[in-house]
Amino acid sequence: MSDVIMVNTEYIPGKRIVKVFGTIWGITVRSRGLGGNLVAGLRSLAGGEIKEYTKMLSDARNTAMERLQSAAEQIGANAVINVRFDSSDIGQVMTEIVAYGTAVLVEDVTDNIQRVGLS
């Protein structure tokens, strides 16, 4: 399991950003396939959720996130902030899913408060 922290916020509570690497991404492209298109087409006639596409997109998002974590590790980042998703269709049978964010190096915030006394 990866130690890369991934959040969709600009900061991580209890952590301080010490280095910004920049934008990174994880991409996957999935094909619906002829069989999936036929089943989905039949289901769309009846209305409701098309479970085959829901599973495909969920799996694709997980793959994109895994690739985003791997990209962070490869450049020495231990966190990714502002994580977002984007998707687009490529032709009529493929879908691209992108997970992207800002790769950073974070460290724990330590409160080094030194007490000063009057002598």
UniProtKB/Swiss-Prot annotation:
Domain of life where this protein originates: Archaea
Pfam families, A to Z: YbjQ_1
InterPro entries xref list: UPF0145_dom_sf (IPR035439), UPF0145_YbjQ-like (IPR002765)
Coiled coil: none
Family, as annotated: Belongs to the UPF0145 family.
HAMAP family registered for this protein in UniProt: UPF0145
Name of protein: UPF0145 protein Ta0182
Organism: Thermoplasma acidophilum (strain ATCC 25905 / DSM 1728 / JCM 9062 / NBRC 15155 / AMRC-C165)
Lineage of source species: Archaea, Methanobacteriati, Thermoplasmatota, Thermoplasmata, Thermoplasmatales
